[in-house]
Curated annotation (Swiss-Prot):
Entry GO terms, CC: cytoplasm
Similarity section: Belongs to the archaeosine tRNA-ribosyltransferase family.
Source organism per UniProt: Pyrococcus horikoshii (strain ATCC 700860 / DSM 12428 / JCM 9974 / NBRC 100139 / OT-3)
Gene giving rise to this polypeptide: tgtA
Annotated catalytic residues: D95
Name of the protein this chain belongs to: tRNA-guanine(15) transglycosylase
GO terms (BP aspect): tRNA wobble guanine modification
Pfam short name (any one): PUA
Length: 582
């Protein structure tokens, strides 16, 4: 598996669920994901690209086929370039005409012609001419059209000179989506849109969208951004981001405005139904619904489009903040109540535990709130219950927890058991100085797996002024610290050495190449491109052991990626090193 193309760089900066805040760089232009691309129709602009740029939209999408087919637009684009023609300095992505192909059945351009045209007009991100098979198409049709898409992908790979989308197709057949994702992952592309879902979104078949996205994500390499083609309503953003979607596009902001429809994060309302605007954007702060209704159609459409854009932008920000706070699942739960079909999709997503758990952070900034029955099925809850089973058997002394059931009291100080809220209180008893070591040993087994407690069995535990376990030492040397915020262990270098001795390879290891070795020894962060191998069991924010190819300990630190991600990612940090051996 190649490590991707240097024309586009993508790295993860923060995460929750399978969602991630990323930094995407194309041609020296940087944006933060999740991001939304307003769709710009070059023949009919409701909002000018320059105004979109002023509003803070750093990426837009337009249709290269529409430009290609229109003689005047084609001449302008070839003469001026796409950025000057649209008067827009941000990242410009283009579609290839696939949507027109799905809508009208045929288009008058070949795959090679549209790719070469995209090169010539200077787009930042291109798209080859895939075939978007509609939902519920006969399997024979889906297979045949997918093979044509893959053939065109091979042609695009040979001639592409710019970062390019490789769209995952396959209708509603999840095995075909996985097959397409595996094949395209092995090729030299930069972004993977998931296509053919607009009819599903329009008919509120969100459950099918979940199955399609998860099937695709399971087979895609995790270092490439994923774009959910045609998903532009804020009602789906939280759910889609929780699945690992990074990019969205919206034509609906303008289409809805033309139909006098007003977007909210919970759905869409007709303008004539509104007495008040439940929003404080510049449009809604200035006008009343009555004033908008009395305006000429063109002016009203433009103002509604601006409102819709502000709502879209606000919801993307809300999703990002939820990721930062470790509250993404809570937002998904809240948004799922907006529509029964969305609620069904949310419940379906929670069935994909194996996929979700790999990316679920091991610890979070916010406490876990039981806000619904579904919150008991969140990945963080299921994982904690599974891990606690062996601790319960070995350490015993079970107490009743309102979320997790019967749990060993020696886990009662640790995330998420202590940092959680339900209808009933969970009483945390402070340990005595004598049994504090049992807490540390139980935490070690929970955090690092079977056998990890042996690294601490002769240690002494110092209590804080509040009576909580804090420093773990042997002969005055610090092995670890029990963190005050989440009750998990941060390793000192002496503790890392002991853990390295008792845990079999490759448990909790991140293996780096010779180039990175001297930097890791000195306590410098480990970047993903230097990682040769990592324990597949490593989860984001785990405490890990950094080693060389001979399994010699170099450093200890906090994983920022899952083990599988570390091996594949080309950009960004893999481990925030806390201490090197030197």
């Amino acid at each position: 598996m190649s490590r991707g193309d240097k024309m586009l760089k993508f790295e993860i900066k923060a995460r929750d669920g399978a969602g991630r805040i990323g930094k995407l760089e194309v041609n020296g232009k940087k944006i933060e994901t999740p991001a939304i691309m307003p769709v710009v129709n070059p023949k009919q602009m409701v909002v000018e690209p320059k105004e979109l740029e002023k509003m803070g939209f750093e990426i837009i999408i337009t249709n290269s086929y529409i430009i290609y087919k229109d003689e005047e637009l084609r001449r302008k684009a070839l003469e001026l370039g796409i950025h000057r023609m649209l008067d827009y300095n941000g990242i410009i992505e283009v579609d290839s005409g696939s949507f027109q192909l799905m809508k009208y059945g045929s288009i008058e351009v070949s795959n090679r012609e549209i790719i070469e045209f995209q090169h010539r007009i200077g787009v930042d991100i291109g798209t080859f001419l895939d075939i978007p098979t509609p939902p519920d198409a006969p399997r024979e049709q889906a297979v045949k059209e997918l093979e044509i898409t893959l053939s065109r992908a091979r042609e695009a790979e040979e001639i592409k000179e710019i970062p390019m989308n490789a769209t995952i197709q396959g209708s509603t057949y999840t095995d075909l989506r996985r097959y397409a994702a595996r094949r395209l992952s092995s090729m030299n592309f930069e972004i993977h849109p998931i296509g053919g879902v607009v009819p599903l979104l329009e008919s509120y078949r969100f459950r099918d969208v979940v199955d399609i996205v998860i099937s695709s994500k399971m087979a895609l390499r995790p270092d490439r951004p994923v774009h959910l083609f045609g998903a532009g309503h804020p009602i789906v953003f939280a759910l889609a981001v929780a699945m690992g979607v990074d990019l969205f596009d919206s034509a609906s902001y303008a289409l809805y405005a033309k139909d006098d429809r007003y977007m909210t994060p919970e759905g869409t309302k007709r303008l004539d139904e509104l007495d008040y605007f439940p929003c404080s954007c510049p449009v809604c702060s200035k006008y009343t619904p009555q004033e908008l209704r009395e305006m000429p159609k063109e002016e009203r459409t433009r103002l509604l489009a601006l409102h819709n854009l502000w709502v879209i932008k606000e919801e993307i920000k809300r999703v990002k903040q939820a990721i930062k706070e470790g509250e993404l699942w809570r937002l998904v739960d809240e948004r799922a109540r907006s529509h029964p079909k969305l609620y069904s999709a949310y419940k379906r997503l929670l069935e994909h535990y194996t996929f979700l758990e790999e990316f679920e952070p091991i610890t979070k900034k916010s406490a876990l709130f039981k806000i619904s029955n579904e919150s008991l099925r969140w990945p963080v809850v299921r994982r904690a219950k599974e891990r606690a089973k062996s601790i319960n058997e070995r350490f015993g002394e079970l107490v009743e927890h309102p979320i997790f059931g019967r749990v060993s009291r020696y886990l009662s100080l640790t995330y998420p058991f202590a940092q959680s809220e339900a209808e009933d209180d969970f009483k945390i008893e402070k340990p005595t100085k004598e049994d504090a070591i049992k807490y540390v040993m139980a935490i070690a087994e929970y955090q690092f797996g079977e056998g990890a407690s042996r690294a601490f069995d002769d240690a002494k535990v110092e209590l804080s002024k509040t009576g909580m376990p804090r420093q773990v030492k042997v002969n005055g040397k610090r092995l670890a610290t029990v963190r005050a915020d989440d009750g998990l262990l941060t390793l000192g270098i002496e503790g890392a050495k002991r853990l390295h001795r008792v845990l079999p390879y490759p448990r909790m290891r991140v293996v780096v190449n010779k180039e990175a070795e001297p930097f890791a020894r000195k306590g410098k962060d480990v970047f993903a491109k230097f990682v040769i191998f990592a324990d597949p069991g490593i989860r984001p924010y785990d405490e890990v052991l950094v080693v060389n190819e001979n399994d010699e300990l170099l450093a200890t630190g906090q994983a920022l990626l899952s083990g599988r991600e570390m091996i594949v990612f080309q950009y960004g940090r893999a481990v925030k090193v806390r201490k090197g051996v030197e």
